[in-house]
Amino acid sequence: MAVKSYQAGVTQYRQSYWQPDYMPLDTDILACFKITPQPGVDREEAAAAVAAESSCGTWTTVWTDLLTDLDYYKGRAYRLEDVPGDDTCYYAFIAYPIDLFEEGSVVNVFTSLVGNVFGFKAVRALRLEDLRFPIAYVKTCGGPPHGIQVERDKLNKYGRPLLGCTIKPKLGLSAKNYGRACYEALRGGLDFTKDDENINSQPFMRWRDRFDFVMEAVQKAEHETGERKGHYLNVTAPTPEEMYKRAEYAKEIRAPIIMHDYLAGGLCANAGLANWCRNNGMLLHIHRAMHAVIDRNPHHGIHFRVLTKILRLSGGDHLHTGTVVGKLEGDRASTLGWIDLLRESFVPEDRSRGIFFDQDWGSMPGGFAVASGGIHVWHMPALVTIFGDDSVLQFGGGTVGHPWGNALAHANRVALEACVQARGEGRHLEKEGKDLLTAAAAHSPELKIAMETWKEIKFEFETMDKLAVANK
């Protein structure tokens, strides 16, 4: 066997990291990047540079390469594809050996795959479009603390989406008035109320006061309605120690569910909190605040389907996924894709929904998809169709904004049950939605007023991040 010798100097990345004949292993972590190269940098060299800089390569030859098996540990760019309708960029597929990453650490995965390489000068823009996690890696991660079935069993609620409300105004209420708003919404027929993502422990409402008044509201509504209720108590905090302190107090006052901002709070904190929830029988609601900073630019950043996979591995029983019909970004096909990635046990490659790889989750439980952001009763037929039963339909202004106060909690429940009944009868909810709601409103003045109030409200803006699908 020839002995390799060290030769100082600079070589092209493609000599070591571009391997078009490579067949990915079942244990490899696979990535699809969208690369916009700098002028004069060819495709293979740019893809190889990304593979090198996101694994074990650097800009020059180093003598310590001879102290390890570089051929085993390096990332390999193995395929390039055109982006339909955009000749300024292309897809690069890269395979990484599983041993490059610490077991069960999505933090470590992100440190490599979306670390310094995103500032690399050889590329003008770089976006991580998708990841394939092998089952060997999935099994090292904690995943959702409980999952869909366990949550339904805890709540004793089956056969329909769950209903929620984000309390408004999101900032400025006193703890007592905040609790009052929660009580009215829960008593009116909702399953959950929710802290907004930016409610932590501000001077106008300290966290302990909020927790106490809210749980009083939850318990009172439960006694009056005979249904299990809950409120997402946001335990996101300045430090992990303070976060756990708030979680422990939520457990002490018998709260069924807490909440965390997983991107703003950090993936390390989120994984730790998910483990705590698993060990303490607490459900975990996840908000995605900050995601659009990362995922909205179609050429640079991280696609939300990747953030969804990372959250499922890190741990969360609920995740906000957008609405398609509301005020937030997200086209229908892409949204359905990442909803499946959150809930299903196996999701096949489907380019029409932006899914670049098969993803096998094994026995890892799925989480509820949360539809939230600019939705109201007129959206109910579409929401039930798009999201199905394993979802939380979260109306904020669409509950608290009713002319009769929180009467819209009752209106939302009536609209939901009318849609679920019609679906069971085989009716087409989106085509017959207006007739269904009008018939239900004949027996619900609360729903009738809500329909009048929001009949002209639409959010018809063009989606910034469109699926790139080849013409057939």
UniProtKB/Swiss-Prot annotation:
It catalyses: 2 (2R)-3-phosphoglycerate + 2 H(+) = D-ribulose 1,5-bisphosphate + CO2 + H2O; D-ribulose 1,5-bisphosphate + O2 = 2-phosphoglycolate + (2R)-3-phosphoglycerate + 2 H(+). The record marks 327 as: Transition state stabilizer. Mg(2+) binds at residues 194, 196-197. The modification N6-carboxylysine is found at residue 194. The keyword Cytoplasm does not apply. InterPro entries: RuBisCO (IPR033966), RuBisCo_large_chain_AS (IPR020878), RuBisCO_lsu_C (IPR000685), RuBisCO_lsu_C_sf (IPR036376), RuBisCO_lsu_fd_N (IPR017443), RuBisCO_lsu_N_sf (IPR036422), RuBisCO_lsuI (IPR020888). Binds 1 Mg(2+) ion per subunit. GO terms for biological process: reductive pentose-phosphate cycle. The keyword Magnesium applies. Keywords: Calvin cycle, Carbon dioxide fixation, Lyase, Magnesium, Metal-binding, Monooxygenase, Oxidoreductase, Photosynthesis. It is an enzyme of class 4 (lyase). Belongs to the RuBisCO large chain family. Type I subfamily. The basic functional RuBisCO is composed of a large chain homodimer in a 'head-to-tail' conformation. In form I RuBisCO this homodimer is arranged in a barrel-like tetramer with the small subunits forming a tetrameric 'cap' on each end of the 'barrel'. This is Ribulose bisphosphate carboxylase large chain. It comes from Nitrobacter vulgaris. The lineage of its organism: Bacteria, Pseudomonadati, Pseudomonadota, Alphaproteobacteria, Hyphomicrobiales.
